[in-house]
Structures are given as structure tokens and as C-alpha cells.
Curated annotation (Swiss-Prot):
Any GO BP annotation: regulation of defense response to virus
Organism: Chassalia parviflora
Post-translational changes noted in the entry: This is a cyclic peptide.
Record carries keyword Disulfide bond: yes
Cross-link position per record: Cyclopeptide (Ala-Arg): 1-29
Comment block on domains: The presence of a 'disulfide through disulfide knot' structurally defines this protein as a knottin.
Protein name: Circulin-F
Amino acid sequence: AIPCGESCVWIPCISAAIGCSCKNKVCYR
């Protein structure tokens, strides 16, 4: 998995728009 440089502790991954998803409080794709 590639980190998207975004955390998802309080809010969902905005980078989900480019295929990222939340894993262990960090957004990965």
C-alpha cells in the first residue's frame, strides 16, 4: 500500500476520490 499523506483519525479520507482508503488511521491506496 502507498500512503496518501493524509490521516483519517477524525475525518474520512478526502483522497478516497483517488482510490485511497483508511487503514490504521492513515489513508493508503
